[in-house]
C-alpha cells in the first residue's frame, strides 16, 4: 500500500543506511488497508495508553523485520480502521495528533532513544511540537533532535484552532502567528517547520522554490526565516526496484 512519493522514500531510504554505523527504525500506522500478506509477519510487542487532552486512547505496538530494518506499527482501530490511509481533514487532524504522541510515548516503552527522529510532511508536523513543549522536561527525550522533510508544500494539515487545541491539549500560547496559527487556523506543517531542528526537502531547487511567494504556499516568509536550517536533498533511486537487469517493462534488460 502506498499513496505517493513519501511511501517510496520511507520504504527505500532506511535499508541503504550502513547497519554497522546506524540503528535505523521506522514507525508507521497499522492501517487496516495494509497488505493482508504482511499481517502474519507482525509480532505484538506491547500496549499502553496515551492522553489526547481529555481523551485516553489505546496504543498497540507491533513489529516486523524487512530488508534488515526494524519496523514498528501503531495499532488503534478507532483511527486506522478505514479503507484508505487518508480520509477527510477533520478526521486526519485528530488521527495524526494521536500518531505523533503515540510515537513519542512508544520510545521509552520499546527502550529506544534515537539521536534523531525523521518526520515527513504535515501528518507528523506535531511531533516536533509535542517533543519540545510536552516532553521537553523529561530526561528520556533530552538530546533527541528532529528533522522535518517537506515533500509537498501544498498539503499543510489546516483546521480550526479551537478543535485542534481540544484534540491536542497544547497550550493556548502556541496558537499564535509565530508558531501554529496560519490565517486563523492551526497548521500542522507550519508547526513542524517552526519546531524541527533541521528541515529538508526533495531537491535543492525545491528548497529555493518554497522560499518564494510563488512556491511557498503562504509560508515563504517562515521558510526564509529558517533558511539556514533548510537543505534540499534529491531523492535517490532504489536499485532493487529500478534495476534494468530485472525490469520487465523494458524491451531488453541491460547493465548500466
Regions found by a protein language model. Give the residues of each.
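N-terminal subdomain of nucleotide-sugar transferases
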Residues: 1-63, 203
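Glycosyltransferases and closely related glycan-assembly transferases
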Residues: 103-116, 125-147, 190, 197-198
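Active-site proximal beta-strand in glycosyltransferases
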Residues: 116-118, 135-173, 200-201, 226, ...
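Membrane-proximal helix-turn-helix segments that form the acceptor-binding/catalytic region
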Residues: 140-141, 145, 169-199, 206, ...
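Carbohydrate-associated surface elements
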Residues: 205, 236
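Acidic anion/phosphate-binding donor-loop and adjacent secondary structure
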Residues: 228, 237-248
Amino acid at each position: 500500500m502506498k499513496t505517493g512519493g513519501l511511501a517510496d522514500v520511507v520504504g527505500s531510504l532506511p535499508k541503504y543506511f550502513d547497519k554497522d554505523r546506524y540503528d535505523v527504525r521506522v514507525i508507521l500506522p497499522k492501517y487496516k488497508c495494509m497488505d493482508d500478506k504482511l499481517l502474519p509477519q507482525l509480532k505484538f510487542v506491547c500496549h499502553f495508553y496515551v492522553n489526547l487532552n481529555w481523551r485516553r486512547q489505546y496504543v498497540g505496538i507491533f513489529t516486523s523485520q524487512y530488508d534488515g530494518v526494524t519496523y514498528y506499527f501503531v495499532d488503534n482501530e478507532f483511527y486506522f480502521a478505514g479503507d484508505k490511509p487518508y480520509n477527510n481533514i477533520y478526521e486526519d487532524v485528530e488521527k495524526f495528533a494521536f500518531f505523533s504522541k503515540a510515537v513519542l510515548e512508544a520510545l521509552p516503552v520499546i527502550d529506544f532513544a534515537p539521536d534523531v527522529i525523521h518526520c515527513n510532511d504535515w501528518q507528523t508536523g506535531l511531533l516536533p511540537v509535542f517533543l519540545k513543549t510536552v516532553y521537553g522536561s523529561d530526561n528520556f527525550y533530552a538530546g533527541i533532535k528532529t528533522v522535518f522533510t517537506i515533500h509537498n508544500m501544498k498539503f499543510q494539515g489546516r483546521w480550526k484552532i479551537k478543535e485542534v487545541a481540544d484534540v491536542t491539549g497544547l497550550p493556548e500560547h502556541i496558537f499564535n502567528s509565530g508558531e501554529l496559527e496560519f490565517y486563523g487556523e492551526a497548521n500542522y506543517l507550519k508547526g513542524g517547520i517552526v519546531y524541527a531542528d533541521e528541515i529538508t526537502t526533495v531537491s535543492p531547487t525545491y528548497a529555493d522554490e518554497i522560499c518564494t511567494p510563488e512556491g511557498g504556499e503562504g509560508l515563504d516568509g517562515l521558510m526564509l526565516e529558517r533558511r539556514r536550517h533548510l537543505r534540499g536533498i534529491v531523492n535517490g533511486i532504489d536499485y532493487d526496484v529500478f534495476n534494468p537487469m530485472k525490469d520487465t517493462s523494458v524491451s531488453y534488460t541491460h547493465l548500466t
